[in-house]
Each structure stands twice: as structure tokens, then as C-alpha cells.
């Protein structure tokens, strides 16, 4: 048991294979050239910049999986999808799905929110609007920005990716 737990706690340090979030092998040679060192460096400038970049988002998701806390980004992404829904019936269905998966106290991927926020969100979702999840989404975003994001920037995943893009750019310019 101790050995297993030791492996789990070291998991985020042992990840150097970025194949999880890079394109399939046949597409890497052309697509990964688009991932510049400047782009990867900018991810450290702000959480918004990281999330707005598809490779940055994928790298962050991979990192959160190594920390067993990917429910936060998955919830945030589900909320982003929810905001795009126009049909009231589809909105109600998606709201219920999000509530059951992330917000309910018995949710399989429960996000860490306070009781008041949980109850207010539950009440807002009785008659969902495109903005019903804004408050809880903002709280989860803030939690990731203040907690997970700084750890990601210091992580081996990010540092290795930064180093790989530096090496690639140096080789390319020679």
C-alpha cells in the first residue's frame, strides 16, 4: 500500500511524456511547430492566456489529472459549454447534468465550494438561465487561478514543455 501511495504522490514529477495533449503522431511534425517557446512562456503571464490556448488548456488538464483534481477544469469547461446553449430544454438538461456531476454533495466529481454557494446554485438551477452558473464557476476559476495554476507553472510538466520548445526553437534557428 505504501508503495502505491508513493507512486501516486510522485506522479506529477514523473510525467515527461506530453503525448496525452499533443496531436496524434502523424500530425505532430506540422502542428507542434505552431507551439512556440514564446507561446508557452506566455502561459505563465496569466491564467486567462493559458486557458485560451488549446495546448495550454490541454497541458493544464493533464497536470490536474496528475494531481487528481481535474474536476475543477472539467466543471469550468462544462459551464463554458452551458453558456452557449440557447434552447431552454437543453439548458435544463445540461444544468441538471452539471449539478449531478459536480455540485451535488454526492456528486462523483464534486468541486470544492462552500455550502452557501452550493445552495444558491441549486436554487438558481430550478429555473436555469445562461448565467445560473456564473457565481460558482467564478469561485472554481478563482480556486484554480490561486492554487492549481501557480503549481502548474512550477510543475515538471510545464518546465519540461518550456525547455522542449526552447531546444526546438534553438535547433530550428541553427
From Swiss-Prot:
Keyword annotations from UniProtKB, A to Z: Cell membrane, Cell projection, GTPase activation, Membrane, Nucleus, Signal transduction inhibitor
Superkingdom of the organism of origin: Eukaryota
Subcellular location: Cell membrane; Membrane; Perikaryon; Cell projection, Dendrite
Membrane topology annotation: Peripheral membrane protein
GO cellular component, one term: cytoplasmic side of plasma membrane
Protein function: Regulates G protein-coupled receptor signaling cascades, including signaling via muscarinic acetylcholine receptors and dopamine receptors. Inhibits signal transduction by increasing the GTPase activity of G protein alpha subunits, thereby driving them into their inactive GDP-bound form. Modulates the activity of potassium channels that are activated in response to G protein-coupled receptor signaling.
Species: Danio rerio (Zebrafish)
Source species taxonomy: Eukaryota, Metazoa, Chordata, Craniata, Vertebrata
SMART domains: RGS
Protein name: Regulator of G-protein signaling 8
Gene responsible for this protein: rgs8
TM stretches of this protein: none
